[in-house]
Amino acid sequence: MAFLSLFLCLVFSSPLMAMPPALQGRKAISPASILKGPSTDNGARDFHGRKFPHFMMQLYQNIISRRDKDLSNLEHPTLQESDTVQSFIAKSYTTVGNHWTLFFDMSSISTNNELKLAELRICLPSFGKSHSVTVEIYHTKDTKEKLFMGSFKTKISSALDADCKVFNLTMVLHNYLIRGKRLIKDEYIQAKGLLLRDLEKSAAEKGAENVDTLKQDKHHVSDFAAERIILVVFAKERSQAKPDPPSLGKQLFPLKYGMADNANKVNGFRRLRRNKKEKTRMDVGTTPPKPVEEIKPKCRKVDMFVDFQKIGWGSWIVYPKAYNAYRCESACAVPLNETDDATNYSYIKSLLPLSDTERRECPSCVPVKMRSMSMLYYENEEFILRHHEEMIVEECGFKDI
C-alpha cells in the first residue's frame, strides 16, 4: 500500500483555505518516524508521561503491516490521498442530561493543508436504554475563550461489542473553517459503534447542576480523554505551482530554510536514451585505451543508520527511534561500461582519454530512487502521524550534478 501517496479516509475534500483568527495558532511542524513498538494492555505506551491514543497506534500498525482490511471504508481511500494525521485529545467535556459538550484545542490545524476527513471517536462503556444525545463541539485554547464549531444529534444505545462510536465531523470543521458558519444538524451521521455511556440525569439532578458540570479533575480528564474522546484529522499538504516533496528540514526549521520559488528553474535537457536492445558502438574518432582488467567497484547502496537520539530529535520522535536510510558509494571508475547505471553524458565523458587529467571527472554515485517513510511524533501535546517522501534510498546510480 503506497500509503499516503499515504494516509487517511476520504469523505469531504474541499481545500482548507483561510482559517478564522480564533483558530490560527502554532503550526504543526516537526515530523518523526514510527516503527512497530510494544503496546500496553490498553493499547497505549507512555511518552513523556503521555499515553498514545489507541487509534493512532492502531493506524500506524495497520500502515506498516499493510493491513488494509482493518481500515474502514472511509479511512482506506483517504489514507491513499493524505500525508498527515493529527490527533486532538479532548481538553475537557461537560455532560448535562442528554447534552454533551466537548472541547478541543485545534490551533495547530494548518492552513497549508487540505482537509480530507475529520473523525470524532468516543469509546465509553455503555449501559441503559436507547436515547438521543446532542453533542456540541468547541475549539478552546484555554478555559476562558470558547469557540462554538457545530453540533449534531445521535441516538445512543447499549451494545456488547467493543467498537468505539465514530462520528464524521468533516462537514462541521469544513463548514466553519472555510465559510465561518456553524453547523447544527440532526441525525448527522450513523455511528460506527454504539458505546457511549448513558449519562442521562434524573430530573432532580438536572435542576441541581444547571450551572456548570465541567470536569475539573485533571487526572480524571486526562485519563478519560486520552483513551475515550479523540478528534482525528486527516489532511494533505497543498501542492504548490511547481510541487516538490515536503522537506523534513523545512518543517523542522521553517525559519532557517527559505521557501524558494522553483518556478523559474531552468528545465534540464532531455537526455538521449540508449537503445538497450541493440548494442550500438559509438564512433568517438579515437578508440580510448583499454583499461586494465580489474574488478571496479560499482555504484552501490550501503548502510547508513540514523539514530534520532544522537542527532537531538529523540525528545519528540515516537517511532522509529532509529532506521536505516542507506547511502550510495563508489570509487572513481572510468571509463564506464554499458552495464553501469549512468546518464548518456556521464558515459560520453568517461570515454575521454584517461591521460587528460584536466578533463577527467568522476561521475557522482547518487540515489536515483527514493522511498517514503511514515513517522509518528509528539508535538505541542499532540500525536501526529505524517508521511515523508524521499527518506530511504532504494537504488543508486551514476549521475552528473
Curated annotation (Swiss-Prot):
Major location category of this protein: secreted
GO molecular function, one term: growth factor activity
Keyword Signal: yes
Residue positions assigned to the propeptide: 19-274
Keyword NADP: no
GO annotation (BP), single: gastrulation
Gene Ontology annotations for the cellular component aspect, listed alphabetically: extracellular region
UniProt keyword list: Cleavage on pair of basic residues, Developmental protein, Disulfide bond, Gastrulation, Glycoprotein, Growth factor, Secreted, Signal
InterPro entries: Cystine-knot_cytokine, TGF-b_C, TGF-b_propeptide, TGF-beta-rel
Known partners and oligomeric status: Monomer. The propeptide region interacts with bmp4 in a non-covalent manner.
Protein name according to UniProt: Nodal homolog 3-B
Annotated source species: Xenopus tropicalis (Western clawed frog)
